[in-house]
């Protein structure tokens, strides 16, 4: 991650580097006015193959900004492979989550190493399998990756093949809340459970619903 919003003193701006390509998101009007300059600076510093604008954030509408998905410099392939810790991961910058991949969780994925060996792992809200693949590579006996998106699970399976762990990674397409209740009723047990749900509260008005969701 090249720029991480407030953490780097640039609220509303995220810039991620995937192999030799960059992807960015702008969430506020102030930085939108500096977009062309931003692209010029990124191109000068990194000399990337391409830079992709992933400005399809719903929050942009609150600032009167359009939804944009476009290559704004060079060329960006439909898919590319990145290296994250011991894993290789397929990334689709144009249609993947956020800027193409949840890079903000890469440190946590690396922290699975001492906990995964020999365990049966349940990865809830797995998206494209970042946690699942790392758990398998770190020696998990089995990994069940669960997500409501079959498109995301298809990428989990491809990532499992890419990393040589397809024999220990299975996928389940289901609503996580429903499946968790079902598994609890069945008395299923896992040595390691990972849950990385989407944001429940994207605005103050959603707080009550978020509290209910987290409790559930």
Regions found by a protein language model. Name each.
Residues 3-16, 32-101, 110:
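Non-catalytic substrate-recognition/targeting regions of SAM-dependent transferases
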Residues 23-32:
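Short histidine-centered catalytic/ligand-binding loop motif
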Residues 26, 55, 147:
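Short beta-strand/turn micro-motifs composed of small residues
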Residues 74-216:
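Rossmann-like S-adenosyl-L-methionine
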């Amino acid at each position: 991650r090249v720029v991480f919003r407030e953490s780097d003193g640039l609220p509303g701006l995220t810039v991620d580097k995937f192999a030799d390509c960059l992807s960015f998101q702008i969430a506020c009007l102030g930085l939108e006015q500096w977009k062309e300059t931003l692209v010029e600076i990124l191109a000068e510093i990194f000399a990337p193959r391409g830079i992709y604008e992933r400005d399809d954030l719903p929050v942009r509408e609150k600032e009167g900004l359009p939804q944009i998905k476009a290559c704004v410099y060079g060329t960006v392939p439909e898919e590319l492979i990145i290296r994250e810790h011991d894993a290789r991961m397929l990334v689709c910058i144009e249609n993947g989550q956020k800027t193409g991949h949840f890079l903000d969780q890469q440190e946590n994925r690396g922290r699975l190493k001492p906990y995964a060996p020999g365990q049966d792992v349940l990865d809830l809200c797995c998206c494209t399998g970042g946690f699942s693949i790392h758990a398998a590579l770190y020696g998990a006996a089995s990994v069940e990756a669960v997500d409501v998106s079959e498109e995301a699970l298809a990428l989990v399976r491809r990532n499992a093949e890419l990393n040589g762990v397809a024999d220990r990674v299975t996928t389940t397409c289901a609503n996580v809340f429903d499946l968790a209740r079902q598994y609890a009723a069945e008395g299923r047990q896992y040595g390691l459970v990972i849950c990385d749900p989407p944001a429940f509260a994207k605005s103050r008005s959603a707080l009550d619903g978020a509290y209910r969701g987290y409790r559930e």
